[in-house]
Amino acid sequence: MVPPTDKLEAATREEIDAKLEAAGWIIQDKNAINLFAGAAGIHGIAVREMDTDTGPADYMLFIDGKACGIIEAKREGANLGQVSEQSARYAVSNLKFIQRWAEQGQPLPFLFEATNIEIFFRDERDPAPRSRRVFHFHRPETFKSWLDEGPPLR
């Protein structure tokens, strides 16, 4: 019998997958990664349960083959404000054989904490990064544009 919390987490992941796909991300499992999958243009890949040296990130986001972000997924009802330290830890973790959109030791730029109901986002390139509620996941093209522009002016 599957414990109720596992069912909640599985349902949450299914809904997050659907929201990521609606935003243009290709969802992949860590055992079958193709960081350049999809049509020509910007390749936005979300890899489930990606290993880091501090544990598996629920999702690691890649733009054109380089890691650019983390999504920490929690079941409905979780306090996302208390999860930001976990996503921040994954964002600075060492990634074997993976290129990054940040220097080693610097955090990946884009971090999300999400349930099936709400999504928090922060840009670690901001001088004083803070999580804020957003209505949906950003599109890969948006992140690519931001990465090409460099750090925000705030």
Model-predicted regions and their roles:
Residues 1-154:
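ATP-dependent helicase/translocase motor core
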